[in-house]
UniProtKB/Swiss-Prot annotation:
Protein name per Swiss-Prot or TrEMBL: Chaperonin GroEL 2
Complex and partners: Forms a cylinder of 14 subunits composed of two heptameric rings stacked back-to-back. Interacts with the co-chaperonin GroES.
Enzyme class: isomerase
Localization (cell): Cytoplasm
InterPro entries, sorted: Cpn60/GroEL, Cpn60/GroEL/TCP-1, GroEL-like_apical_dom_sf, GROEL-like_equatorial_sf, TCP-1-like_intermed_sf
Keyword terms: ATP-binding, Chaperone, Cytoplasm, Isomerase, Nucleotide-binding
Protein function: Together with its co-chaperonin GroES, plays an essential role in assisting protein folding. The GroEL-GroES system forms a nano-cage that allows encapsulation of the non-native substrate proteins and provides a physical environment optimized to promote and accelerate protein folding.
Family: Belongs to the chaperonin (HSP60) family.
Gene Ontology molecular-function annotations: ATP binding; ATP-dependent protein folding chaperone; isomerase activity; unfolded protein binding
Annotated residues for binding of ATP: 29-32, 86-90, 413, 478-480, 494
GO term, biological process aspect, one: protein refolding
Entries under PANTHER family matching the protein: 60 KDA HEAT SHOCK PROTEIN, MITOCHONDRIAL
Catalytic reactions of this protein: ATP + H2O + a folded polypeptide = ADP + phosphate + an unfolded polypeptide
Species in which this protein is naturally found: Trichormus variabilis (strain ATCC 29413 / PCC 7937)
Length: 560
């Protein structure tokens, strides 16, 4: 495949054009008065969204050089989403401003490497400053964080706060689509473990790349399973019941895994397998936790139990199991409450006796997984388009809430970034001259999110930035009402983790763009043009379709 190579200023300008094309489409969604973006779908109805990451993912540019720039911004947005769960639009606006200011200075003769060093050192100092000013989140602040992130939807804010209260901050909260018109909160007992499917061939939902099983039997063992013969008795019993089966084992490999995959593909048995979580003694304890939660038994040779003699009573049960690439959620229902409480009490006693910080952390994690349960927010709406938009907003709000609980909160609405800009002059005192220019690039870029929030609200961004600069730490611009007020009191707050991640990821990619001297991309293939004079001939009649032979009987199940 032939390549296009671009150098120097030409390469950086191509990247900037790509960055601007994507960022301009994303940044109009920022703030309480952010506009919507309509996305055409190849199949189905167009989607109307107000979510930065969703817009960013949809954009692909025709020019391969510019598209490289766009993809860098997609990475900023995706990384921010992965780490903090929200703040993707803020990160996009920041990186666009950093690149714009930085490239001006590179074109004027500044050393890109020194600029990058200045940007990196300034960002590092500002991240420490965010940690200093962040306040712990408690009480009504949880609902306020969720409300702001959900586009000022107070119903969603209250629902997420309620979910956090019910399952504790250590519990698991998921968002699902509902068939009704209303959005509801449903709390069920459950556990999330950090192990995904052993083989992608177990996947049942191709769109989400997940395994989803309902009314499941669970085989829990600390053994490594390599021979299918060990599993045959259990598989036969479960196949007769017609229920899906989840196998949790040290590992499933060789012909055991191959046979399970083949029978799943043929539709003979709905089955999936995951590796047991943890290691050593902790693994056994976690498997015992899962057994108690699912009302099953840990099959271990240490207690005289083997796979080939396991009865159906030894298998755990779960209402629903969702297995992703890296984690598994088990919803067991409310069947074993007293046993769960006994187990939690036992772990708490261990927690009181341990002196090890590591052991203490792991024991608390186990209590959270047993006690926390799972809250499910079922999103309802009148149309599919509204449903998808509402679901995205709720997922953003949920992620923002988790981030707030993790690292605390700061004033929102771009105010914290303006405050950070005021600290840059102090930070850069010991920098060399070109590093100081890098620090100033960060200082100017930090104003961009507030400027954009104001522009989206239909007011002059420069005027708003100037007034907010002159106010105290908590006072900023409320774009929803057009007032300058105490943002914390008004409930306009951001999770510190979101602000930190947006700044770090934006600075990282901006530094890479500024120090880029060449781009190598694949040359697009030219599509063969149709012959100019070739009128389309009449379509020949379709021949009769031959009779379809009788379908052979389905073979017996391979493992029996």
């Amino acid at each position: 495949m032939a390549k296009i190579i671009s150098f120097d200023e030409e390469s950086r300008r191509a990247l900037e054009r790509g960055v601007n094309a994507l960022a301009d489409a994303v940044k109009i969604t920022l703030g309480p008065k952010g506009r919507n973006v309509l996305l055409e779908k190849k199949y189905g109805t167009p989607q109307i969204v107000n979510d930065g990451i969703t817009v960013a993912k949809e954009i692909e540019l025709e020019d391969p050089l510019e598209n490289t720039g766009a993809r860098l911004i997609q990475e900023v947005a995706a990384k921010t989403k992965d780490v903090a769960g929200d703040g993707t639009t803020t990160a996009t606006v920041l990186v666009q401003a950093l690149i714009k200011e930085g490239l001006k200075n590179v074109a004027a003769g500044s050393n890109p490497v020194s600029l990058k060093r200045g940007i990196d050192k300034t960002t590092e100092a500002l991240v420490a400053e965010i940690a200093k000013v962040a306040k712990p989140v408690e009480g009504s602040a949880i609902a306020q964080v969720a409300t702001v992130s959900a586009g000022n939807d107070e119903e969603v804010g209250a629902m997420i706060a309620q979910a956090v209260e019910k399952v504790t901050k250590d519990g698991v909260i998921t968002v699902e689509e509902s068939k009704s018109l209303t959005t509801e909160l449903d709390v069920v007992e459950g556990m999330q473990i950090d192990r995904g499917y052993i083989s992608p061939y177990f996947i049942t939902n191709n769109e989400r790349q997940t395994v989803e099983l309902e009314n499941v039997r669970i085989l829990i063992t600390d053994k490594k399973i390599s021979s299918i013969q060990e599993l045959v008795p259990v598989l036969e019993k479960v196949a007769r019941l017609g229920q899906p089966l989840l196998i949790i084992a040290e590992d499933v490999e060789g012909d055991a895994l191959a046979t399970l995959v083949v029978n799943k593909a043929r539709g003979v048995l709905s089955v999936a397998a995951i590796k047991a979580p943890g290691f050593g003694e902790r693994r056994k304890a976690l498997l015992q936790d899962i057994a108690i939660l699912t009302d099953g038994q840990l099959i271990s040779e240490e207690i005289g139990l083997s796979l080939d003699t396991a009865s159906l009573e030894a298998l755990g049960t779960a209402q629903k199991i969702t297995i992703e690439k890296d984690n598994t959620t088990i919803v067991a229902g409310n069947t074993t409450k007293p046993e769960i409480q006994k187990r939690i009490a036992q772990i708490r006693r261990q927690l009181e006796e341990t002196d090890s910080e590591y052991d203490s952390e792991k024991l608390q994690e186990r209590i959270a997984k047993l006690a926390g349960g799972i809250a499910v927010i079922k999103v309802g709406a009148a149309t599919e388009t509204e449903l998808k938009d509402r679901k995205l907003r709720i997922e953003d709000a949920l992620n923002a809430t988790k981030a707030a609980v993790a690292e605390g909160i700061v004033p929102g609405g771009g105010k914290t970034l303006i405050y950070l800009a005021s600290k840059v002059d102090e930070i850069k005192k010991n920098f060399d001259e070109e590093e100081k220019i890098g620090a100033d690039i960060v200082k100017r870029a930090l104003e961009a999110p507030l400027r954009q929030i104001a522009d989206n609200a239909g007011v002059e961004g420069s005027v708003i930035v100037s007034r907010v600069k002159d106010s105290d730490f908590n006072t900023g611009y409320n774009a929803a009402t057009g007032e300058f007020e105490d943002l914390i009191a008004a409930g306009i707050i951001d999770p510190a983790k979101v602000v930190r991640s947006a700044l770090q990821n934006a600075a990282s990619i901006a530094g890479l763009v500024l120090t880029t001297e060449a781009i190598v991309v694949e040359k697009p293939e030219k599509k063969a043009a149709a012959p100019a004079d070739a009128g389309m001939g009449g379509m020949g009649g379709m021949g009769g379709m031959g009779g379809m032979g009788g379908m052979g009987g389905m073979g017996g199940m391979g493992m029996f």
